[in-house]
Amino acid sequence: MVSCSDKLTTSKAEKLIAEKLKEKPVEKYVTLKTGEISLFGYNEMRKADIYEKLQKEGLITFIKKEGLYEYRCSINLTGKGKKYVVDTKKIDRMPYTENKIKSYSITLDKVEEIHLIPMMNAAEVLTSFKVEKTPFVALEDQATLSAIGEGDYVSKKIEFIQLENKG
């Protein structure tokens, strides 16, 4: 991020971050196939547990038929689950539809601290973000789940660079 004034304050940092988030919101999505689906292999088959959890929450219907190396299943969104759908695409010649579903979004909570680095005309800002998760966040990969954590907040360091000739 770029700061144009000579002293970066908490309120200035929050304003700059909020402007950037307004310009480019942080919203993440997962794809959920609905209709008749086959799940192959360990990674796909482990999703069956997630689908069962989403069904218990009333977000989808999930019917599975176990095979030796695959699950054949039927997945459909309920009215409650459809509230999270952003886009739907019917796949030609396939017995399923791909649904783009909101997984989580991140908004600014607060700037926790600012560490100025005068020799580099820079600052390191420790920032807290609120993570608003939907129930479909469970479909994210393990790396994403680790990055956003289990709680409602995540901290991140952001570097600011002062541009003397711009303001």
Question: Which stretches of residues belong to each language-model region?
Answer:
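Basic amphipathic alpha-helical segments that dock to polyanions
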Residues: M45-I63, G67
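C-terminal motif of bacterial Sec signal peptides marking the signal peptidase cleavage site
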Residues: V2-S3
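Short beta-strand edge/turn micro-motifs at domain boundaries
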Residues: T61, E124-L126, V131-E132, A138-L139, ...
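Extended amphipathic alpha-helical interaction segments
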Residues: V86-L126, K130-E132
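Post-signal-peptide N-terminal segment of Sec-exported extracytoplasmic proteins
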Residues: K22-K53
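Accessory beta->alpha helical hairpin/"wing" motif in late/C-terminal subdomains of nucleic-acid enzymes
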Residues: I63-K102
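Short, non-transmembrane alpha-helical segments in secretory-pathway proteins
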Residues: T9-Y29, D87-T97
